[in-house]
Structures are given as structure tokens and as C-alpha cells.
């Protein structure tokens, strides 16, 4: 919680949206569960990509309105389809979310994912592990018998399964 900028992230893609005029607004979180995912708007022109799917051209003339959650694409071609690929923070651990929704857990605090590759998070985890070992004189060896990986679970705006891959590591 102390470092929300170090929460695990994933790339998402908006729906295909057809332009009806020379400006198009795409609600990027439409059909995604807002309790699970939050767009990472830091340096979005570097990490996000807008594509004219009719021509496969990458579009650079766009802005993001954080208040409305819309990407505004300028100089669009009417009747061309466009998408936005964007980074989003995984603000609710997918496995915890799945269990909470499936089992109707009420009042359950949302567990967050964290990315141990990030410097502050890595330090936190290593310090906690060191402390665990130092406080236990009877422990000589710590054996990891399970390696944690994240299933890919994306839910829609109604908290239903949108995309689920129980066998992959794409959210790790």
C-alpha cells in the first residue's frame, strides 16, 4: 500500500471502436472490472499505443482525459476501427478476487499484488524475510516447496470472468 507505483501491472487492450467523425473517444476501462484494474497514466505516451486497426497504423495524435477515463484520438478517419493498448495496475490480487467473488466474502480487504522486481518492494520483502530468519534460531534452512505464479484472471464490469487462463503465467 505504501508504494502503489510498484504494484504489478499488465497490458490491456480496449474494444475495437469505429470512428464516426474525425475525433474519437474511447473509454479504455469499458468492460473491465474497476475494482481489479486501474490504468497507469504515468508517461502514457511512452507505454500506451493507439492503433488504427483498419490500416494497422500507430497513431500518435491523441490525449488522455483522466477525469473521464477516455483516450481522445484526433484526426481519425470515419469508419476506421481504433484500439488503445494500455498499462494497468492490478489493484486486487486476481486469485484473492476470484475467491472473494466466488464465495461472496463480505467486507474482505482487497489483497494487492506486488512486483518484487521493483526496488522498494524488493527491499521490503528481503527485510521481512531476513527478520523471519533472524527471529528463529531453530531454523537453519528455508525450503521453498511452492513457487507462486499468477493465473490470468480478468473480470468484466459486472465482476464476471472476461478472460481466464488457469494454466498460463502471463500475469506473473
Indicate residue ranges for each PLM-predicted region:
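Glycan-processing catalytic domains of CAZymes
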Residues: 1-172
